[in-house]
Amino acid sequence: PVAHTSIIKGIVSKAMDWQAFAIFMGMKMENKLREVIVGSTVGSLFGTSPCPVWAIPSDTVYAPLETIVYASDFEEEDIYAIRSLAEMASPFRAEIRIVHIATEKEFTGAVQMDWFREFLGKELSYKHIRFELLLSNHIQNRLVSYLKEEDVDLLVMLERENKSFLEKWLRTDMVNKMESYAKIPLLVFREHNHQVFYFAPSYE
């Protein structure tokens, strides 16, 4: 057990002491109050953890990963997170879908995607990657609907220093947020602090 006045500080302290490669948080939503408490803990860990954080819904049933969605802003830091993600996906030969949701006022989405695809191709040889550019003024709702439509096994995001995409996701009402993404596991990397998963990648 972790004895600490702050749940977050206690978890982070132990993770650092043990040099943990990941933190796994279970999410059991028995009532609305518990949703808020658990959601607050998980959300705070995203920005303070020394390693990647997994948020796992209580009713998750183990199955080999087949479809992984990485919610991207098509920025350089995404490259390094995706490279770590590919190491994890490689033993399963899972498909990584790099999804960007652009608003109707954002005219550079397609240009960014082409640049990012070329950049990623130089840095990573993993074969099972595809790109999706979605248009919507309601980023959270569109992402949730996409996850439902495509039967996704894992959602991956990058916690950035300037927040950006993940802030747009987490900024919404806490209960609604938990209800939305707690249907599938969520993995969050921190910018400049994503770790390798210690798999032996074959990049097939």
What does each model-found stretch correspond to?
Residues 43, 86, 118, 144, ...:
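Active-site phosphate/pyrophosphate- and oxyanion-stabilizing loops and adjacent acidic/basic residues
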